[in-house]
A protein has these predicted regions:
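Claisen-condensing/thiolase-fold acyl-transfer catalytic domains that form or cleave C-C bonds
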Residues: 12-16, 22-59, 67, 131, ...
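Phosphate/pyrophosphate-binding loops at sites that engage ATP/ADP/AMP, CoA/4′-phosphopantetheine
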Residues: 1-7, 141-157, 223-224
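Condensing-enzyme catalytic core mediating Claisen C-C bond formation in acyl metabolism
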Residues: 79-144, 148-151, 184-195, 201, ...
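Short secondary-structure capping/junction motifs at helix and strand boundaries
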Residues: 3-5, 56-64, 109-111
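Short coil-to-beta-strand
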Residues: 8-17, 109-115
């Protein structure tokens, strides 16, 4: 498989004008669609690429995303060189990248469903605590996805949020509890899985476009291939803020996009 086999690339990142995405794609010589949903870009890119394949607009589509700690800190908070004291609720942007090739040929892992999220704003203003701001969006998309796919929480082996981190994931669990839903071991957050918050100096956990993408490729896909998981739901979360809005004391609108992966036993045995 080579770049010449690709019909379209769908990708995004955290930098202004999708700088990293466009610099990467310029060497591929493949039609490219840039997408942005902050840290929910991973699910948006994969979902969009899946739709292009499903609708017959592409035989093979590449979905990719990336993030890097230093430029993200410079753009959304403060340059690392400033040595600004961070709050305990701050997350650590993951330096990483991931890509997935989607096609019509049956594979052991399939994208079963994709749900676009709505923008949710609970009037949170603290840019150093974006996990709390994003939790309501994750809950909203979870409900939408379950309704859209006629599924229940019991149908999934894993339900993973993108990067709510310790504070935001705890808030989501509280919101679920208020609805009578117990967030058991099937629930987790990619920002808590990619780092060990008890041993690494990452404050509240991981974040960034690469957070959910790297966990999906490295851990979720491994579990699906091994047969330890059958259906996994990824709720990638994004805080749609800019420093200009923060300077103006505006609130932080958030969004979550859902991607559901399923193990295909027929493809695994063939």
């Amino acid at each position: 498989f080579s770049c010449s086999d690709l019909d379209v690339c769908v990708g995004g990142d955290l930098m202004n004008q999708l700088l990293t995405t466009h610099y990467f794609a310029r060497d591929l010589h493949v039609p490219t669609l840039g997408v942005y949903a902050a840290c929910a870009t991973s699910s948006l890119a994969i979902g969009t690429a899946s739709l292009l394949v499903q609708q017959g607009m592409a035989a093979h589509a590449l979905a990719f995303t990336s993030s890097h700690n230093a430029p993200a800190e410079r753009q959304f908070r403060f340059p690392n060189e400033y040595a600004v004291q961070k709050k305990d609720t701050t997350t650590t942007t993951v330096s990483g990248a991931g890509s997935i090739v989607l096609g019509r040929t049956p594979q052991p892992i399939a994208v079963r469903a994709f749900t676009l999220g709505r923008i949710v704003d609970w009037h949170h203003q603290n840019a150093s605590d974006m996990g709390i701001a994003m939790a309501p969006a994750a809950l909203d998309t979870l409900h939408a996805h379950l309704a859209q796919t006629n599924s229940t929480i019991d149908d999934y082996d894993w339900i993973l949020t993108g990067d709510l981190s310790k504070a935001g994931f705890g808030f989501l669990c509280d919101l679920l509890s208020q609805e009578g839903i117990h967030a058991d071991s099937r629930f987790n957050d990619c920002g808590l899985m990619i780092y060990d918050v008890s041993r690494q100096p990452v404050f509240c956990g991981g974040s960034g476009c690469a957070c959910s993408m790297c966990v999906s490729i490295a851990e979720v896909f491994s579990q699906l291939r091994a047969g330890r998981k059958k259906r996994v739901l990824i709720l990638a979360t994004g805080a749609l803020l800019s420093m200009m809005a923060i300077y103006q004391k505006d609130t932080i609108p958030c969004i979550a996009h859902a991607i559901e992966y399923q193990r295909r036993d027929d493809a695994c045995s063939s």
